[in-house]
Every structure is written in C-alpha cells, then in structure tokens.
Amino acid sequence: MFHRTTVLRAVLVIITTVVIGGCGQSPITPVRLENAIEPTFANLVELQMSWLGLPPMAASDFGVTASCRKLTGGKTGAGEWACNVAWLGPSGRTLRDGYDLFVTTDGCYTATIEGNNLGGPILKAADGRDVRNLLFTFEGCFDTT
C-alpha cells in the first residue's frame, strides 16, 4: 500500500509539473494587440480616404492609439477582446470607436465595429459610388514569437 501511494504521488507531481510548465504566459497581450491594430487601422483609414475621393492623408497623420482588454478568462490569451481606438479625423478632431475582436492562438484577429459610428458596411464615395467600409470589419495578424 505504501509503495502504491508513493507511486501515485510521484505521478501526480509529474503531471502537475508538465501542466504548469506548459501554461506559461500567453504571447497574446494587450500591448501586442494594440501595437498590431494601430498601424492596420491607420493604413485602412488612409486607403478608405482614397476610395471615398477625399483629400489624401498619410497613415501617420491619423495618430491612431488603441486600448484593448480581454473580456473573459484573464488578461492575456486568445478569445474575445474589446478595443477602443482613438484617431484624428480629416478635420483634426479626435474620433473614438469601439471594436469587438476575436483573437486566435496564432495572433490573428477579426475586429468588428460596435454600432454604426462609421456608417455601416457600405459608404457613398464623393462621386456617388458605393464603396466597402474598410473600417466596419477588418482582420489582421501579429507575431506571437
């Protein structure tokens, strides 16, 4: 009986060590996600301006900043996130938009606007054409290594 209990304890210690060792800090963090969303969003705004026939602006002129938080299950890792994006519109006024994100374990995400702040999935260009709203839903990936 003593030998069996000792073996069982040893097995439990090994299993616990393996499980804990495999559960290191996730590479998916708020900072990494924010650093991925900011340039992606800025580049999409720059392209959107062109599609709408508005005066061109460089992506860096939009001064995009993001603030992200995981909605469930801790502060890091794959799953559902929310990000607030602040950026300078063409008039120089600060605009704020909220996005719901789903982030996968490989660092890829899909961002969908909360509400219709940015005009819905289709916008009217200056010449009357319908154009896809690139800011309504967008995807991106970041390095998790």
What is the role of each PLM region?
Residues 1-4, 28, 52:
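Short, aromatic- and cysteine-enriched interfacial helices/patches
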Residues 32-49:
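Post-signal peptide N-terminal segment of mature Sec-exported envelope proteins
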Residues 7-10, 33, 59-64:
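A broad structural signal for short, well-ordered beta-strand segments within beta-sheet-rich domains
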Residues 77-145:
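Extracytosolic low-complexity repeat regions of secreted or lipid-anchored proteins
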Residues 23-26:
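Bacterial signal peptide processing site
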Residues 1-21:
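Sec-dependent bacterial lipoprotein signal peptides
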Residues 44-75:
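Post-signal-peptide N-terminal segment of Sec-exported extracytoplasmic proteins
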